[in-house]
Structure formats: C-alpha cells, structure tokens
C-alpha cells in the first residue's frame, strides 16, 4: 500500500522498452513486487542510511525515503535522464554526486558520506561496470550492497547476472518475484543483496 502512489515498470513501460530498446518513462524502472520485497528487507534490517547509484529520474529514492525517512539519503548519477528530456526529482534531504562513480571525486564524496546501511547499485549494467561499482563501494563502511537486474533476462542486464552468479563470498539474499504488472509469472529483473 505504501508503494501504491508510485508508478513502477508496467505494460506501458514494457511496450516502450520493446519498441525503443530502452524504457524511457518517468517511473521506477523496477518490478513493483520486488520493490515491496526490498522495502520488507529495509524494514526487517532497520536500514537508516541509503545510497542509490544510478537513479534514472529519482523515483525509487523518492519512494523509499518517503516511506522510511532515512537519517542519511544519498544518490550518485551521471544525469542520463536529463539528456533524454526528463526531470530528475529528488527529496530535499538527498546528498547528490553528479558524475562517474569511477573517479577520485566520487571516492572523496563517498568517503565523506561515512557509513551507509544499504547501497543500491543500479548504474552501469555491463559486467565490468557493476563489478567496479561493487569493488569501489565495498571499500567504504556499509552493511549491505544491493544490485538490480540480477536475473540478466535481457541483453542489457547479462553483465549484472554474470557478476551476481560469480559473487561467491559473503552472504546473499535474492528478491525475485513474478512481474505481475507485465503479466509474467516469473522475474525478469530481480534484486540481489550482499553482505560480508
């Protein structure tokens, strides 16, 4: 119910994706049921600080901060949505880094953030990109690192799936639920959560 006001990836989004090979829509580009699962995880593990890497238009961070009112909320993004004609809308409390996460400037910014309970990595979906974001963020104080698109169901997300499958250290949780909003009885996205 808490997620009800927010549009997630639905049949319209899927049609855009199939037509243009990209989901260019101002919404949360995730499976609603999996976001609900993420919210359950956040509640169960008392997540009070959140960093999202790769935010599109900011829908997920708006929804999560709106529900959980994190003590610390931060985002890192290169602003791709703006180049596609969309506004990026973030809560006032958000600390934002605009630029590539593989830079000394990002590392300095991330270090200043300090401990983050949950880092959601949803930026570069290529294998080397997601691995790089994992390795960078693993260096800084955190409890959990999460990844979107672990199923690798389309050619744009196979790098995430490969990385997730190879990640054989620490503890892993998977949130993979049927994507009902597009009429599927299985997950084509998936959220993976990892801890040391």
Predicted regions and their residues:
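A short alpha-helical cap/connector motif
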Residues: 1-120, 124-196
